[in-house]
Amino acid sequence: MNKEASNNNNSAPDPYYILRGHKFNVNSVLFDKVNPNLLYSGSGDGELKLWNIEEKKCISTQIAHSEGIGGGVLSLQWLSNDNNNENNNNNDEICGNILSQGRDGVIKIWSIIDNCTFKNTYRLETNSLSLGKCSSLSSNLLSISGSAIDPTSSTSQVEIWDLKNKQVINKLKPNNQQLFEKLGLPMSLKLYYENENNDNSNQSNDQIRLCTGYENGELLIWDLRNTSIPLVSSKLHNEPILSFALSNNSTKGISGSGDTNIIEFNINYESKQFNITKTHKLNNGGISEIKIRNDEKIYATAGWDKRIRIFNFKKQTPLAILKYHTESVYSIDFNSNNILASGSKDCKIALWDIYTTKK
């Protein structure tokens, strides 16, 4: 029997607080990128909540999406609050904007008013009914799986939407029919600028890339200037790639799937491949989400086996296995103070203070 390696498991901390209030599984947690004390969460019944983790209470609740089969909140994304100010007819103090993705294919944008109230400022109906989470870039572009209501639609296709004009401006699918057929559904997506270190305001759409994890276990990088041939591609897993994360400079990353491997890799544009640098073997398969902390010293994974795993990103070594949740962990996120939040099928959100520097 394979025994999963980890360091200091016996001393792994408990969460310092549990946020209760959701009645259905918590599918997504997201920290505010301006105020680290604000946390957003979305659940399977379509409920969107705003929490103040310093005061340890929920300060706003909104029904964001329909509930039931095919309903609920699938993911939450942070947006800059520039473009949506044009919809602010009441001169409200907008503290930020978040995007919510429903399982029914509906995309909504919510302005946060006075750090305590949700205001729906945008609605977009797409054809996507897949289980893959969308990826937003600034407040202009959105990538989403193009497979959906029409069973004859192209299952491997990814659509790039202009959020402002509510139009599909690009469709990504390989020209090679054999590759197209074997990829299967896009399961995980990330839009990013070719050079993340540049000021985003100076970037053009021609410099945008999309990394996509597919149902057959392959990871591909696309250049939006030429969407017929991927820039980089490799088969990393034997199961669908459910989550991956890239470093700030997009030169390395981590991927997880339905199998029992967490894979760390470098991106080699010359060989057009992902070079595997480390494989972490797990006792139980299934990784829902991966997040790299802002300082890139550690990363965390959310597991189907109720566990949160912490790794040293630079040394590629396991640090701890966090145990609290009684059901699968679906989502995790770090705030700028390095607090970790985890959302689970058990309807609870756990807050963890781990590997942080005390002042």
UniProtKB/Swiss-Prot annotation:
Superkingdom of this protein's organism: Eukaryota
Gene3D superfamilies: YVTN repeat-like/Quinoprotein amine dehydrogenase
Entries under InterPro entries matching the protein: G-protein_beta_WD-40_rep, WD40/YVTN_repeat-like_dom_sf, WD40_repeat_CS, WD40_repeat_dom_sf, WD40_rpt
UniProt keyword list: Repeat, WD repeat
UniProt entry tagged with the keyword Repeat: yes
Pfam families: WD40
Membrane-crossing segments per the record: none
Keyword presence, Repeat: yes
WD repeats: 21-61, 68-120, 132-171, 192-232, 236-275, 282-321, 324-359
Name used for this protein in its record: Guanine nucleotide-binding protein subunit beta-like protein 1 homolog
Source organism of this protein record: Dictyostelium discoideum
Classification lineage: Eukaryota, Amoebozoa, Evosea, Eumycetozoa, Dictyostelia
Gene: gnb1l
